[in-house]
Amino acid sequence: MAPPSVFAEVPQAQPVLVFKLTADFREDPDPRKVNLGVGAYRTDDCHPWVLPVVKKVEQKIANDNSLNHEYLPILGLAEFRSCASRLALGDDSPALKEKRVGGVQSLGGTGALRIGADFLARWYNGTNNKNTPVYVSSPTWENHNAVFSAAGFKDIRSYRYWDAEKRGLDLQGFLNDLENAPEFSIVVLHACAHNPTGIDPTPEQWKQIASVMKHRFLFPFFDSAYQGFASGNLERDAWAIRYFVSEGFEFFCAQSFSKNFGLYNERVGNLTVVGKEPESILQVLSQMEKIVRITWSNPPAQGARIVASTLSNPELFEEWTGNVKTMADRILTMRSELRARLEALKTPGTWNHITDQIGMFSFTGLNPKQVEYLVNEKHIYLLPSGRINVSGLTTKNLDYVATSIHEAVTKIQ
């Protein structure tokens, strides 16, 4: 008799919530259905948007007979890496001028986080540092915990961030938790458009955060998934990163070009490394090369070529910033419109937090039972946390969504 399958005892894993939500939405035959769960930009017709500048550059690449499908270097396309790091740090960055910056092309922002986490687990402040505490915001993007756990970190903690009562930043709690963190802890920071809350510190608050991190010798690991996409302004969205450079920090910054280029399925990311001197950057990159080699070996070229071609050409760069502003402005408009409708309906509670927040997501303050009502009764799909993708709102569904939220809040406590 043949033995049972070697896979017979494998337990069924829970589906990834945000992707299951989209699958449920697709299968729902109700014509009123609205998807506010997906983490991607949508037009006012609820369609994905291929940026006009991306179409133009793709055509240019297709017509370039000098290009081929040879392997890229392990660390990626050199022009892409330098352009990406420059976008985050700014043309006049002292770190760039002093040649103490390195970049690693990665598979999206998640890949950049993972390469950085793997490196830190092996080499941060010595060797084998899996017991170093890693701090993530409460709440945070769920993959932050998963990536650092998978890299072997055993002590993942949260710092206070969201004040549910005020529906804003718990700055004092944030600062207190940093103050009490063991020296040399790693702190994951959202560079802009915090996911899922949409609440960002002001420049003055960032200064306070940096001050505490400096005297506690804490290591910043920025996650920059929305530069330009948050406010429509590339410089404003990179303010915190550039301030930390000016304060002399060494840090990592995971960059994603999924949102601001609309290149979701091309997996275009970059890990920017800022050190104290050029020599240490070369040493760090040499070890990261080893990690990449056993992880994905070589990155794909197409998305990196699109981004590098755009960022290195002044005309295309200007067109791209216009495309990004189009997306950011539509989201800002949808925020204002949703708030206005809820206030006109006299929906219980305050709704100014919707316009105080920034970026693609809004933490509505809806509780899990209210969310359940919206999903089951109104066919409006959103995460149990109450997070919505604001770009899922359109001029056609705004009234329906607002009245449905009003019903949920009024009927269900």
UniProtKB/Swiss-Prot annotation:
Disulfide bonds: none annotated. One of its GO terms (molecular function) is phosphatidylserine decarboxylase activity. The modification Phosphoserine is found at residue 149. It comes from the Eukaryota. L-aspartate binds at residues 39, 141, 195, 387. Its cofactor is pyridoxal 5'-phosphate. Keywords: Amino-acid biosynthesis, Aminotransferase, Cytoplasm, Phosphoprotein, Pyridoxal phosphate, Transferase. GO terms for biological process: 2-oxoglutarate metabolic process; aspartate biosynthetic process; aspartate catabolic process; aspartate metabolic process; cellular response to insulin stimulus; cellular response to mechanical stimulus; fatty acid homeostasis; gluconeogenesis. It is found in: Cytoplasm. Coiled coil: none annotated. It catalyses: L-aspartate + 2-oxoglutarate = oxaloacetate + L-glutamate; L-cysteine + 2-oxoglutarate = 2-oxo-3-sulfanylpropanoate + L-glutamate; (2S)-2-aminobutanoate + 2-oxoglutarate = 2-oxobutanoate + L-glutamate; 3-sulfino-L-alanine + 2-oxoglutarate = 3-sulfinopyruvate + L-glutamate. The modification N6-(pyridoxal phosphate)lysine is found at residue 259. Gene3D superfamilies: Aspartate Aminotransferase, domain 1, Type I PLP-dependent aspartate aminotransferase-like (Major domain). GO terms for cellular component: axon terminus; cytoplasm; cytosol; extracellular exosome; nucleus. Its EC number is 2.6.1.1, 2.6.1.3. Homodimer. Biosynthesis of L-glutamate from L-aspartate or L-cysteine. Important regulator of levels of glutamate, the major excitatory neurotransmitter of the vertebrate central nervous system. Acts as a scavenger of glutamate in brain neuroprotection. The aspartate aminotransferase activity is involved in hepatic glucose synthesis during development and in adipocyte glyceroneogenesis. Using L-cysteine as substrate, regulates levels of mercaptopyruvate, an important source of hydrogen sulfide. Mercaptopyruvate is converted into H(2)S via the action of 3-mercaptopyruvate sulfurtransferase (3MST). Belongs to the class-I pyridoxal-phosphate-dependent aminotransferase family. In eukaryotes there are cytoplasmic, mitochondrial and chloroplastic isozymes. This is Aspartate aminotransferase, cytoplasmic. The gene is GOT1.
